[in-house]
Amino acid sequence: MSFKKIIAIVLSVLILLSLLIFGFVRYLDTNRDIIISEAKIATGVDSQMLPIKVTNFFPKNTEKISAWISWRNAKINTQLLVKWHYVTDDIPIYDYSLTIPKKEGVANVVLAMPEGKSLPSGLYKVDILLGKKRLIKTLTFEIQ
């Protein structure tokens, strides 16, 4: 077999593999129950449910943190699980189940301390899962 034929076969196989992989990734992307278009950590939300003071760093004595989530192309009644975790001491804090009510929208999940108390200093993360297993997004933040 000539060198040109070997190169042609190798290139054909590579092109075929690329098409198969691209097609599979595209299939996975179009067959989701939901697409998280944005997810942000903020101090809260305004009257239009938009995040206020988006940041990943919060001062000492912070009492409340918001995890704001925007989605699209959702199947109605899709279940999300929002898991708050104190990374510094590896402590799970709070799990919140969210049932998606419409194809497109936003949600705000709040972690708040009782009045007069503040969240401990350290590193935190928020995992957003489809159902209880499939991780969709992780957000991180720090309290000084």
List PLM regions with ranges.
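Hydrophobic membrane-insertion alpha-helices, especially the h-region
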Residues: 9-22
